[in-house]
Amino acid sequence: MFEKRTWIRLPRNVVVGHGVLGQTIEAVSELHLTGRPLVVSSPTPHDVAGKQVVAQFEDEGYDPSEIVIEEASFDAVQQVIDHASDIDAGFLLGVGGGKAIDITKMAADDLGLGFVSVPTAASHDGIVSGRGSVPEGDTRHSVAAEPPLAVIADTEVLAEAPWRLTTAGCADIISNYTAVRDWQLAHRLKNVHYSEYAGALSQMTAEMLVESADSIKQGLEESSWIVVKALVSSGVAMSIADSSRPASGAEHLFSHQLDRLVPDGALHGHQVGVGSIMTEYLHSGQKGKWRDARDALAAIGAPTTADELGIDDETVIEALTTAHQIRDRYTVLGDGMSEEAAIEAATVTGVI
């Protein structure tokens, strides 16, 4: 008897391009959201775009409220929940990078309210996915939530963000290639459910970004266009799979372990990018495609070595040998690799 079923939750509106921040009201109106809007941002994004979003709602006769959060934490999520309850918010808008959007996403999910994502930096695929990431102590928690009802990504705003945030977003996408390989491996060895559609979309997105790496340059709005479209595709792949598997494999375990060992280390995207160089080597050996990943990262100015991450060699090896302990997710790391094997992988690929 056939009993398969799936429920794919996707954004209804994805508005990307030059000056689209000015279309926020139009995009929200099409969603038929009612009630008082709550705009959530962090300090810099509040100045860059949050004030403009609030002003748009005021001009249209809404009574918007706003809250500026200082850090990504479960306490901040609760602050947003409490504020939204106090003002009887009808829907939430997250304006910013990963911090504000993840917190808004999780708060909206807890409240059962609609959520609109307004990224000010193309730094990771959380701008469209149904997962939030929040640190707690030396651990970073990945929490399931509803994806945004709409994404409004103004490439003019994104192009003004610090370039390192854009290169982190690129690296996050490039790492999808090894994430999919890990997913396929888990399917073959552990019978983990694998979605051909989600896997193909994620892999294609990574490959297209690698091919476009030479065109991604600082100061070009076109670069933001390329990167944000890739981030949207990656988020959609996760929604189709109802899992972070299409975009999170051993390279993400490596990054999360680095977060534990070096809490104020490099950007998430940069860490997974370096991780993907080594995990691709583990998948395909010395003649594999790890050079393609490394060269693409180098072309956009993203780190490819421990030194460029600002992390010492010993910590990289420790993270690689213990990354499998982060969560119960089968990857090429299996039940752990020896220190000798980790040193070889990091040395051959030039990471250390």
UniProtKB/Swiss-Prot annotation:
Residues involved in substrate binding: D125, D172, H256
Q: What does this protein do?
A: Catalyzes the NAD(P)H-dependent reduction of dihydroxyacetonephosphate (DHAP or glycerone phosphate) to glycerol 1-phosphate (G1P). The G1P thus generated is used as the glycerophosphate backbone of phospholipids in the cellular membranes of Archaea.
Protein location:
Cytoplasm
**EC number(s) for this protein?**
1.1.1.261
Q: Which GO terms describe its cellular component?
A: cytoplasm
Task: Report the cofactor remark.
Answer: Binds 1 zinc ion per subunit.
**Which GO annotations describe the biological process of this protein?**
glycerophospholipid metabolic process; phospholipid biosynthetic process
Corresponding gene?
egsA
Family assignment? Belongs to the glycerol-1-phosphate dehydrogenase family.
Q: Which GO terms describe its molecular function?
A: glycerol-1-phosphate dehydrogenase (NAD+) activity; glycerol-1-phosphate dehydrogenase (NADP+) activity; metal ion binding
Task: Give the top-rank taxon of the lineage listed in the UniProt record for this protein.
Answer: Archaea
Q: What class of enzyme is it?
A: oxidoreductase
Annotated NCBIfam families: PRK00843.1 (NF002022)
Q: Which reaction does it catalyse?
A: sn-glycerol 1-phosphate + NAD(+) = dihydroxyacetone phosphate + NADH + H(+); sn-glycerol 1-phosphate + NADP(+) = dihydroxyacetone phosphate + NADPH + H(+)
Q: In which pathway does it act?
A: Membrane lipid metabolism; glycerophospholipid metabolism
Cofactor(s) listed: Zn(2+)
Q: Could you confirm whether the keyword Repeat appears in this record? A: no
Q: Which HAMAP family match?
A: G1P_dehydrogenase_A (MF_00497_A)
**Annotated binding of Zn(2+), by residue:** D172, H252, H268
Where NAD(+) is bound, by residue? Answer: G98, K99, A100, I101, D102, T120, A121, A122, S123, S129
Major subcellular site: cytoplasm
Q: Which UniProt keywords apply?
A: Cytoplasm, Lipid biosynthesis, Lipid metabolism, Metal-binding, NAD, NADP, Oxidoreductase, Phospholipid biosynthesis, Phospholipid metabolism, Zinc
Q: What is this protein called?
A: Glycerol-1-phosphate dehydrogenase [NAD(P)+]
